[in-house]
Amino acid sequence: SNRPMPLNTYQFKNMIQCTVPKRSWWDFADYGCYCGRGGSGTPIDDLDRCCQVHDNCYNSAREQGGCRPKQKTYSYECKAGTLSCSGSNNSCAATVCDCDRLAAICFAGAPYNDNNYNIDLKARCQ
């Protein structure tokens, strides 16, 4: 689909490029049961588990009134592959920034299995 990317998704993409510079962020946009389009079943590996944790983090951020993680912009820095969230973020922005920061760090530490890209969600993510 050619929907414009929500602003925060753009920031999350940049965070991923900070911690995993050798890979395209697209590699993470459709991976396993939780990265990108999915959101059900048992995560199929460590990287997929990173995305499940990120989904859960966004869900708990939504419980703060009026906090919409996919639209929320925040202030952060990437220095030499290290991410930090700015102290000037309001509570929603701080929460969402930390969700994204922890996921990007998790991605950097998890092996990438090409066989788990663009899997059949119906068959494998019940």
UniProtKB/Swiss-Prot annotation:
Q: Which cysteines are joined by disulfide bonds?
A: 18-78, 33-125, 35-51, 50-106, 57-99, 67-92, 85-97
Query: What residues does Ca(2+) bind to?
Result: 34, 36, 38, 55
Could you tell me where this protein is found in the cell? Secreted
Q: Which residues of the precursor form the propeptide?
A: 1-7
* PROSITE patterns in UniProt: PA2_ASP, PA2_HIS
User: Which segments does the entry list as coiled coil?
Assistant: none
Tell me if Oxidoreductase is a UniProt keyword of this record: no
Q: For this protein, what does the record note about how its cofactor is bound?
A: Binds 1 Ca(2+) ion.
UniProt xrefs under Gene3D superfamilies: Phospholipase A2 domain
GO (cellular component) term, any one: extracellular region
For this protein, what is any one GO molecular function term? phospholipid binding
Q: What is the first-listed, main subcellular location in coarse terms?
A: secreted
According to its UniProt record, which reaction does this protein catalyse?
Answer: a 1,2-diacyl-sn-glycero-3-phosphocholine + H2O = a 1-acyl-sn-glycero-3-phosphocholine + a fatty acid + H(+)
Q: Which cofactor does it need?
A: Ca(2+)
Name the enzyme group at the top EC level.
hydrolase
Q: Which GO terms describe its biological process?
A: arachidonate secretion; lipid catabolic process; phospholipid metabolic process
Q: Which Pfam families match?
A: Phospholip_A2_1
Q: Which residues form the active site?
A: 54, 100
What does the record say about tissue specificity?
Answer: Expressed by the venom gland.
Superkingdom of this entry's organism? Answer: Eukaryota
Q: Assembly and interactions? A: Heterodimer formed between two homologous isoforms: isoform 1 and isoform 2.
Which PANTHER family has this protein been placed in?
Answer: PHOSPHOLIPASE A2, PHOSPHOLIPASE A2 FAMILY MEMBER
Q: What family name appears in the similarity comment?
A: Belongs to the phospholipase A2 family. Group I subfamily. D49 sub-subfamily.
Purpose of the protein? PLA2 catalyzes the calcium-dependent hydrolysis of the 2-acyl groups in 3-sn-phosphoglycerides.
The name this protein goes by in its record: Basic phospholipase A2 1
Organism, scientific name? Naja sagittifera
